[in-house]
A protein has these predicted regions:
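Conserved hydrophobic positions within beta-strands
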Residues: 116, 278, 380-382
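Short, conserved beta-turn/loop elements at beta-strand boundaries and strand-helix junctions
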Residues: 118-125, 283, 384-390
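Charged- and aromatic-enriched interaction segments used to assemble
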Residues: 127-255
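Surface-exposed, non-catalytic interaction/assembly patches
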Residues: 2, 29-34, 68, 143-152, ...
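Surface-exposed cap/loop segments at beta↔alpha junctions
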Residues: 64, 69-178, 195-196
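Juxtamembrane "anchor/assembly" segments of surface/extracellular structural proteins
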Residues: 1-93, 131-140, 305-408
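Extracytoplasmic/secreted envelope proteins and their assembly/folding machinery
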Residues: 113, 157-161, 204-207, 275, ...
Length: 408
């Protein structure tokens, strides 16, 4: 994955001087008079959740001295088909498809396609009335029922492909309402995973978490009207330029005092342990299973530069957990996963940089100029992109996952 310095990015984006956004409702750009009323646009994503957006709109018309979008309508006017009634219904939560783009003049990126879900007007005692409209990625419509399920010895794309075939035990209907398309080339390069569990999750939320874990994307691909029998489907796989509103697969390099506006890391040893033991039961032999993973194992390379500090803090020697595992290999892999998850929580950070539409949850970022303990490679868990009165900024939360920690 290429590493991009923000000075090079600045040249491509004309110095980040002209941020721009675009809102389309049912395929049409919002009218210019509505566009001028948009005070702020925000997009949020999280590596475990469906992404969302928020618009803050001026809700006062000084020419008529009345509310513009919410607050002046009548039950009768809402049933009419006039320009005024259409404006009153413009931001109603419903099935209208909304496309949000953000970026810079000449280079806008699709952040999401979604639906309005919430209207929140503000009628203050002083100051201008505003309307805040929130929405979710169109994928939220696929949240139907939560399931518990598990796969053994499968690749992520195989899991996605199989999920599309599963049926609900009570209704007999397919659990997932759309066919799922995977990338066969990506499948051939994926590692086989011994055990993956869906734990009381919506299928779409489970798929999103698996996709972001691998740096993949998920999107709804509309039916091709030129192809007979073509149908709407869900794509699970790597971003492909020209096929989807894709993002560049890049790692940004951000340096304190140059490209980082602020950076607030937290280092904690409170919940760290030296080893994890997983107990299970071998159904074939009828014997108990016990496997252990330790930080002394050579495979634990993330944040290894902090292990010396951890040893001085005398972390708990061990945690023992009972897990639904049935082979020694499953128990070993589960112990490794638990210990690795603990290890990743040692250093977390929140930060702000200039607006970067390609900086998303599930991607990596290199932090430099903050010393040996806090410089390094971070995995982004959440981002918030905002275009408003202060220009375009991207705020993100991340956890340090440095391989050796050589950066300073």
């Amino acid at each position: 994955m290429p590493v991009v310095d923000l000075f090079a990015e600045s040249r491509d984006q004309r110095g980040f001087y002209a941020p721009q956004f675009e809102i389309r409702i049912r395929g049409a750009q919002i009218p210019n008079d509505v566009l001028r009323d948009v005070v702020e646009v925000t997009y949020k994503d999280n590596w475990k959740e469906i992404d969302s957006f928020e618009l803050t709109v001026n809700n006062w018309d000084p020419s008529t001295n009345s509310f513009k979008y919410v607050g002046a309508e009548t039950a009768e006017s809402l049933q009419q088909d006039t320009s005024e009634s259409r404006r009153h219904r413009l931001f109603e939560p419903c099935n209208k498809e909304v496309e949000v783009k953000m970026g810079y003049v000449g280079d806008l990126k699709v952040m999401l396609t979604g639906n309005f879900t919430t209207m929140e007007p503000n009628f203050p005692s002083s100051g201008a009335p505003t309307l805040t409209v929130r929405g979710l990625n169109i994928l939220h419509q696929l949240r139907r029922k939560q399931y518990v399920y598990a796969w053994e010895n499968k690749r992520d794309s195989e899991i996605a492909d199989n999920l599309a075939t599963l049926r609900d035990r009570e209704t007999g209907q397919k659990r997932f309402p759309l066919p799922i398309e995977i990338d066969q080339n990506a499948l051939s390069t994926e590692p086989q995973i011994d055990y993956v569990a869906e734990q009381n999750q919506y299928d779409i939320d489970f798929l999103l978490a698996r996709a972001r874990q691998r740096g993949y994307v998920i999107f709804i691909q509309e039916a091709d009207p030129q192809v007979r029998g073509s149908q709407r489907r869900l794509y699970f796989g790597p971003s492909q330029e020209g096929r989807i509103p894709g993002l560049r697969d890049v790692t940004f390099k951000l340096e304190w005092g140059k490209s980082l506006i602020d950076f607030k890391p937290t280092l904690t040893t409170a919940n760290q342990v030296r080893s994890v033991t997983v107990n299970g039961w071998n159904r074939r032999t009828g014997r108990p299973i016990q496997e252990r993973a330790s930080l002394d194992d050579r495979e634990f390379t993330r944040n290894r530069d902090l292990f010396e500090l951890l040893q001085r803090c005398d972390p708990r020697e061990e945690i023992v957990v009972e897990e639904p595992v049935f082979t020694p290999r499953q128990a070993r892999d589960r112990a490794r996963a638990i210990l690795m998850d603990r290890q990743k929580e040692m250093v977390k950070a929140s930060a702000t940089t200039v607006g970067l539409p390609d900086l998303r949850a599930g991607k990596l970022v290199q932090i430099e100029g903050l010393g040996a303990r806090f410089s390094g490679t971070y995995f982004i868990t959440e981002t918030t992109h905002t275009i408003g009165g202060n220009g375009y900024t991207t705020r993100f939360n991340a956890r340090r996952e440095d391989q050796g920690g050589q950066s300073t």
